[in-house]
Amino acid sequence: MSDLDKQIEQLKRCEALKESEVKALCLKAMEILVEESNVQRVDAPVTICGDIHGQFYDMKELFKVGGDCPKTNYLFLGDFVDRGFYSVETFLLLLALKVRYPDRITLIRGNHESRQITQVYGFYDECLRKYGSVNVWRYCTDIFDYLSLSALVENKIFCVHGGLSPAIMTLDQIRAIDRKQEVPHDGAMCDLLWSDPEDIVDGWGLSPRGAGFLFGGSVVTSFNHSNNIDYICRAHQLVMEGYKWMFNSQIVTVWSAPNYCYRCGNVAAILELDENLNKEFRVFDAAPQESRGALAKKPAPDYFL
């Protein structure tokens, strides 16, 4: 059994790696991720997953429902970290799987894969608490800069964390972005990670999030038509049923963190696409209390409130 396989087994038990192992893993991951496009090509069959947010034991439920990697080909739409108790183990397991099976798992960047955001919503504090220094946070946030911004399944399904941008009409414009940087406060790269579809908006609207935009059905229709895609698949917003279609099935939100923040009471979903792009949503609940680690039984920290 290789060192990497041992580390994967260890991470599957929700046991953190040594700092030196994290550093080496991140360096290996960087070599793989640097080769990926801003619009990374993904072949079907594939299973698409939304936000995880450090909910490690719920991600284990996800793998129970969807199958283990590499048997199942996975695409994760970002927001691996923050808010949950196990951001370190969650992100490192996904990263280790990426290094071990680079063609069977695709990771794209969410708005929480950012230095600034993780200093507010938990990942920075978790790294400090678990390692006694900021080094692991630094290695991981350096990797965030290398994550792709979007994916394209069989040239037909455009997958992104947040949504669209008024600065982007074509996929080639996304391909031209220099992604290897902290998420900017505005502009195309920011919008892809922060924007949301909104029923009551026609065209573009201001986002209450303070970053990105709200966009209406006409924007989606025109983007899908211009780029010859069937629909957009995105995450970024909690939906109580785990997934939600909008604008005559032109865009779907997939949310994969059940009972979000350990209190929202929502179910989660993943989207399974077969080789002909037929869809099946698999809905699942949070992991039962007895299968969780000791940490999750503690009261929620302040930033949930």
Swiss-Prot record:
GO terms for biological process: reciprocal meiotic recombination. Mn(2+) 2 binds at residues 79, 111, 161, 236. Its EC number is 3.1.3.16. Ubiquitous, mostly expressed in root mersitems, flowers, and vascular tissues. Mn(2+) 1 binds at residues 51, 53, 79. It catalyses: O-phospho-L-seryl-[protein] + H2O = L-seryl-[protein] + phosphate; O-phospho-L-threonyl-[protein] + H2O = L-threonyl-[protein] + phosphate. It is an enzyme of class 3 (hydrolase). One of its GO terms (cellular component) is cytosol. Keywords: Hydrolase, Manganese, Metal-binding, Plastid, Protein phosphatase. InterPro entries: Calcineurin-like_PHP_ApaH, Metallo-depent_PP-like, PPA2-like, Ser/Thr-sp_prot-phosphatase. Binds 2 manganese ions per subunit. GO terms for molecular function: metal ion binding; protein serine/threonine phosphatase activity. The active site is at residue 112. Its cofactor is Mn(2+). Its main location: plastid. Belongs to the PPP phosphatase family. PP-4 (PP-X) subfamily. This is Serine/threonine-protein phosphatase PP-X isozyme 2. It comes from Arabidopsis thaliana (Mouse-ear cress). The gene is PPX2.
